[in-house]
């Protein structure tokens, strides 16, 4: 029994290691990319949230029940989702099959199927730890985009009276506002949201207005150059055609960037190969453990570590407060006079904090 407990403790301890280069980031330096793993951890009772494959299977099931897909097509898509590796292509073909032959985004039965699968999701939140961790980072300036169709994060945030807002790429004004950091609680759904019949798209051709808009593309790609993207619960995001079109294709010197991806380490050989491959994209792959059960706790602990970082503004406020009841001008002069001493004290404090992390 003791041996089992020690092994478990070692495993848990190993899953709690953090890269110093990541936990010393200010929250406002981060852009969180949320994938299906987050939804799966939050609402484990909904199979459609567990993976892309499960989501597509649930949509096919809904299409069959709603009788919006020919039985022969239902059988063919079930075969594809079982055998095909590129699930994004399967999902794209499924959308096309339930959309007008003209290629227009609406009207489409695909959205009805998504509503069948995802409606009333808020009632199924069972483990909000990951959502709370993400909100804590958003409170401190982190940005969020997602490849998910669901709005679990927004629903959870509204419960806490946060002014959450969902947006997709079809609203240029809001996208620019979000990308420039003026929408603190905005969540960009790059595939659209299940509640929006026009916004659900998997093919970059559906976003021609965006990808051909120089202003929008420059602002979005500038995020990839200047922010540290933190991929949370993402599996195939870098193979996602829309993500590639928005962030990867036109951003040079990706190896000079510093992004992070949290992954499950099921197989060591695969993990270390994936780690080496992702460095070419400027992405550091980090394992949260060898079991998905470690994921929520790892994200919570990681967010806690990052939120400990004091922003430069906070330091200035704290230093001014220490001066007691002096007037504001006197306080400023005092800070300037003792700037070197204050800086030294802060450096020593930072050193102490770093040693304890």
Curated annotation (Swiss-Prot):
Entry keyword annotation includes Nucleus: no
Positions where N-acetylmethionine occurs in the chain: 1
Topology relative to the membrane: Single-pass membrane protein
A cellular component annotation (GO) from this entry: membrane
Record-level Gene Ontology MF annotations: identical protein binding
Family: Belongs to the FAM118 family.
Name of the protein in its database record: Protein FAM118A
Gene source species: Homo sapiens (Human)
């Amino acid at each position: 029994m003791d041996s089992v407990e020690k092994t478990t403790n070692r495993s848990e301890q190993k899953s709690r290691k953090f890269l110093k280069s990541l936990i010393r980031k200010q929250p406002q330096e981060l852009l969180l990319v949320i994938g299906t793993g987050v939804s799966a951890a939050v609402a484990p009772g909904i199979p459609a949230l567990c993976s892309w494959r499960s989501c597509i299977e649930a949509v096919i099931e809904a299409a069959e029940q709603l009788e919006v897909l020919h039985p022969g097509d239902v059988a063919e898509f079930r075969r594809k989702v079982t055998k095909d590796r590129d699930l994004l292509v399967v999902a794209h073909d499924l959308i096309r099959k339930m959309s007008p032959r003209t290629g227009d985004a609406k009207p489409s039965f695909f959205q009805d199927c998504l509503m069948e699968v995802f409606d009333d999701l808020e009632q199924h939140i069972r483990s909000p730890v990951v959502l709370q961790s993400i909100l804590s980072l958003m409170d401190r300036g982190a940005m969020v985009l997602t490849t998910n169709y669901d709005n679990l994060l927004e629903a959870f945030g509204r419960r806490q009276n946060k002014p959450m807002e969902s947006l997709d790429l079809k609203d240029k004004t809001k996208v620019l506002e979000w990308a420039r950091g003026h929408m603190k609680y905005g969540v960009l759904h790059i595939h659209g949201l299940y509640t929006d019949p026009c916004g659900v798209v998997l093919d970059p051709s559906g976003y021609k207005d965006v990808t051909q808009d120089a202003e929008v593309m420059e602002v979005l790609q500038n995020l990839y150059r200047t922010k540290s993207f933190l991929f949370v619960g993402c599996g195939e995001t870098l193979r996602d055609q829309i993500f590639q079109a928005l962030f990867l294709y036109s951003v040079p010197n990706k190896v000079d960037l510093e992004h992070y991806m949290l992954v499950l380490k099921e197989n060591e050989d695969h993990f270390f190969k994936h780690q080496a491959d992702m460095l070419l994209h400027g992405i550091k792959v980090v394992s949260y453990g060898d079991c998905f059960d470690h994921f929520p706790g790892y994200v919570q602990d990681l967010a806690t570590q990052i939120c400990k970082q004091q922003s430069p503004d906070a330091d200035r406020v704290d230093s001014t407060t220490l001066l007691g009841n002096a007037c504001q001008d006197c306080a400023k002069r005092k800070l300037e006079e003792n700037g070197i001493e204050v800086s030294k004290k802060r450096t020593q404090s930072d050193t102490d904090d770093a040693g304890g992390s």
